[in-house]
Amino acid sequence: MARFVDPLVVGRVIGEVVDLFVPSISMTAAYGDRDISNGCLVRPSAADYPPLVRISGRRNDLYTLIMTDPDAPSPSDPSMREFLHWIVVNIPGGTDASKGEEMVEYMGPRPTVGIHRYVLVLYEQKARFVDGALMPPADRPNFNTRAFAAYHQLGLPTAVVHFNSQREPANRRR
């Protein structure tokens, strides 16, 4: 009998970025016409702009989306774990991340060495974050998704997806 192995466990997202959780809503992400599935490879040049992240849920519910790289600066020495790439808050359910408020501007993947994981984590908010209630993190390196969620009382994630990216070879002219 075949057993299902969660790709978030295999990809070490559960454990290194988030704790074990039960997904409670649907979240899809895409760069252009390329859908993101757990563990897929996305070229950095294809991810220069924020992905389209659609979430289910009721219109009255609000969500926070966080994107990090737990492998910065390199998978063998992740001394900047987690590197923060994006935070969007107050996303209404049943819409997409563009309907929320960008707290930390999107920064696309820029892996320098090795294959990096990029993790999109969605949390349900207890209430709307009003101006001034949230302070953006001081720095992008060494961000901690769990600590951010705990501080803002977000609880466990409602959905998570991750993709891989690696440095693209430079065009060589001869």
From Swiss-Prot:
Species this chain originates from: Oryza sativa subsp. japonica
PANTHER family: PHOSPHATIDYLETHANOLAMINE-BINDING PROTEIN, PROTEIN MOTHER OF FT AND TFL1 HOMOLOG 2
Reported induction: Induced by abscisic acid (ABA).
Any coiled-coil regions, as ranges: none
Family (UniProt): Belongs to the phosphatidylethanolamine-binding protein family.
Name used for this protein in its record: Protein MOTHER of FT and TFL1 homolog 2
InterPro entries found in the cross-reference section: PEBP, PEBP-like_sf, PEBP_euk, Phosphatidylethanolamine-bd_CS
Its job: May form complexes with phosphorylated ligands by interfering with kinases and their effectors.
Domain of life: Eukaryota
Gene symbol of the encoding locus: MFT2
